[in-house]
From Swiss-Prot:
One of its GO terms (cellular component) is membrane. It catalyses: 2,6-dioxo-6-phenylhexa-3-enoate + H2O = 2-oxopent-4-enoate + benzoate + H(+). HAMAP family: Biphenyl_BphD. Residues 36-271 form the AB hydrolase-1 domain. Keywords: Aromatic hydrocarbons catabolism, Hydrolase. The record marks S112 as: Transition state stabilizer. The gene is bphD. This is 2-hydroxy-6-oxo-6-phenylhexa-2,4-dienoate hydrolase. Pathway: Xenobiotic degradation; biphenyl degradation; 2-hydroxy-2,4-pentadienoate and benzoate from biphenyl: step 4/4. Substrate binds at G42, G43, N51, N111, S180, R190, W266.
C-alpha cells in the first residue's frame, strides 16, 4: 500500500465562487488518474485527512487521483459564516476547487455533511460529476422511524456549544459501534483539532441559526440526480437514520444500497477494508 502522510500531501488553493472571494481551501492530494474528491462530515474538529486516512492509500493504489478537501470553516480552510444551507454552499466550494485546479469532472465520496455536499453538487452541477459514493449522508429530510434530530446530532451540537474533552468522548462513543476502536490517540487527535480553530466552532453555530438543519432537505430534487450512486450506511448509525438510505434508493434513478452491520456513522473508517473494496469496485464498473 502507498505510504502517505498528512504533511506530505498537504496543499492550499484560493477559490473564487459565489460567496467565496480569494478563499483559502486546504486539501490533501495524492495519486494519478481519474479524480476522486472525498468530503468529510460536520463534527467539531473534522477534516479531510482525519476522515479518510484509512481510504486514501487504497484508492491511490487503485489508480485514482485522490483529493481530501477541508470544507469551508473546517480544519485548515478559512473561517466562514454561511447564510444558506451548508450542503449547497459547500457544493459551490467543491466547484470552486475543481475550477481552480482545472478538474472538469470528478467522482465524489461524501460522509454525513460531506454526503449532503455531494448530493447538492450532483443536483447543481450534473455535468461536473462522475459517480457518487455516499456514507450516511445528510439531506434526505425527516425520518419515518427515528425522532429527529437523532442522539448523535444532539451531542454534536452540544460539543460545538460546550467544547470539552468529555463532550467529545460522549459524541465519539455514539459515533462508532465498536467501542474498542475508541483510543486515547483518536480522541486526543480530534481534541487538538477542535482547539486549533475555536472560530470554526462559533461560526458553525451562527450558521446553523441562519440556515438550520431543516433547510438541508433535498428530497424533492433527488430525482434530478443522474449520476450512478453507491449508498452505504451503518446499521447502527445514531446520527442519520437508516431509512434515509431507502429514501435515497427510491428517489435516485441509478442507485444501490449497502448496509454494514455492527457499524455506526463512520463506515469508511470503522469498516475501512470492506468499504474500500466495494467503493473501488463500484468506480471501476462501466
Amino acid at each position: 500500500m502507498t505510504a502517505l502522510t498528512e504533511s506530505s500531501t498537504s496543499k492550499f488553493v484560493k477559490i473564487n465562487e459565489k460567496g467565496f472571494s480569494d478563499f483559502n481551501i486546504h486539501y490533501n492530494e495524492a495519486g494519478n488518474g481519474e479524480t476522486v474528491i472525498m468530503l468529510h462530515g460536520g463534527g467539531p474538529g473534522a477534516g479531510g485527512w482525519s476522515n479518510y486516512y484509512r481510504n486514501v492509500g487504497p484508492f491511490v493504489d487503485a489508480g485514482y487521483r485522490v483529493i481530501l478537501k477541508d470544507s469551508p470553516g473546517f480544519n485548515k480552510s478559512d473561517a466562514v459564516v454561511m447564510d444558506e444551507q451548508r450542503g449547497l454552499v459547500n457544493a459551490r466550494a467543491v466547484k470552486g476547487l475543481m475550477d481552480a485546479l482545472g478538474i472538469d469532472r470528478a467522482h465524489l465520496v461524501g460522509n454525513s455533511m460531506g454526503g449532503a455536499t455531494a448530493l447538492n453538487f450532483a443536483i447543481e452541477y450534473p455535468e461536473r460529476i462522475g459517480k457518487l459514493i455516499l456514507m450516511g449522508p445528510g439531506g434526505p429530510g425527516p425520518s419515518m422511524f427515528a425522532p429527529m434530530p437523532m442522539e448523535g446530532i444532539k451531542l454534536l451540537f452540544k460539543l460545538y456549544a460546550e467544547p470539552s474533552y468529555e463532550n467529545l468522548k460522549q459524541m465519539i462513543q455514539v459515533f462508532l459501534y465498536d467501542q474498542s476502536l475508541i483510543t486515547e490517540e483518536l480522541l486526543q487527535g480530534r481534541w487538538e483539532a477542535i482547539q486549533r480553530q475555536p472560530e470554526h466552532l462559533k461560526n458553525f453555530l451562527i450558521s446553523a441559526q441562519k440556515a438550520p438543519l431543516s433547510t438541508w432537505d433535498v428530497t424533492a430534487r433527488l430525482g434530478e440526480i443522474k449520476a450512478k450512486t453507491f449508498i452505504t450506511w451503518g446499521r447502527d448509525d445514531r446520527f442519520v437514520p437508516l431509512d434515509h438510505g431507502l429514501k435515497l434508493l427510491w428517489n435516485i434513478d441509478d442507485a444501490r444500497l449497502h448496509v454494514f452491520s455492527k457499524c455506526g456513522h463512520w463506515a469508511q473508517w470503522e469498516h475501512a477494508d470492506e468499504f474500500n473494496r466495494l467503493a473501488i469496485d463500484f468506480l471501476r464498473q462501466a
